[in-house]
Amino acid sequence: MWINFLWALVPIIWLIISLGIIGMPASRACTIGLIITIADAVLMFKQPIINTLSGALEGIIMGIWPIMYVILAALFVYQITTDSGSMGTIEKLLSSITTDKRILVLIIAWGFGGFLESIAGFGTAVAICAGILISLGLEPIQASVICLVANSTATAFGAIGLPVLTLAEVTNLNDVQLGFIVTLQLVILVILVPFILVILTGKSIKALKGIVFITLMSGVGMAIPQVIIAKFTGAELPALVGSLFSILVTVWLTKRKTGSVEEVENEGVSEIIKACSPFILVFIFVLLASSLCPPVNNFLTSVTTHLHVYLGKNPNDLPINWLSSPGTLILLAGIIGGKIQGLSLSQMFKVLLNVLKTIGMTTITVCAIVGLAKVMVY
């Protein structure tokens, strides 16, 4: 028994050594890890090679659909918004609300950063929000640390709940229950992190003076909606809705405290809506496709292909949800939003090709790691 236990740890030990100690590129380390896991299963656990290979293939397919499909779509929407110049409008809007750097950190790094992470994932929030904070006068290292800390809870759901949905697929757990449990685990951290961000901004606990209530509500305003949304819809929307509520609550309390919010120069309401249109559409489409709208949900989920890839006993059902997949909904939102923002179909196609080029190594990494996990499960 102990021998089997030790052999089962070999793939995990390899990943720890190759990634954490040697510093090997993730794509290479995970691919070698997959090969080691297959050899381990066949030679040490006496699994039929055809079963082992089909289990790995199931994981690779899962890595492509839905994981990389969602990542592709999320990065496409983000890049569309950037290329059209709309991201600049959003950044200007957020930075015009107050001159208090502590509150700006709550709005930009915490609220907007959480929103970007829930839409695009990939640590996009850290890069974008750190750049905004640096332009507003924060030191580069300070801004980077603040954004990394702010992103610590948002990554639990990633882009449209992808990590939780993937965990549900791999473990055969209910994704709605899993999403709800994750939000409950995060509640204390979600309330605590805004206080840490304010302290990091002011470089002292005294930085909380005068904005303790705003800081508290910035966290509570994210935590409560996350729990409620996860309870009734699943893992796709909690981070997105929670971050939006946090921004709204923080801005509203700031307005009450200061008595006014600066106007955004040269930007009307229509321009702001235009800039946010892809994200608004993502929210609407994902909401309509959820179990909250049974007629739409039933129609979209009816267009599904069921695969049984594993050739051994008790194979998992691998559903390919062509219409209800978050990737399809996000892509559609990006295309419509891109048209609203004035981009042509040819421009959007070029954006899509560029995104495909950038995620090549990531695709290899994800497919290898999910394939590895599936072999270990079977």
Annotated model-derived regions:
Residues 7-16, 24-46, 68-74, 215, ...:
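Hydrophobic mid-bilayer segments of alpha-helices in multi-pass membrane transport proteins
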Residues 53-136, 342-378:
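Membrane-embedded alpha-helical segments and adjacent helix-loop junctions characteristic
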Residues 16-17, 38-42, 114-115, 166-167, ...:
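Alpha-helical transmembrane segments of multipass membrane proteins
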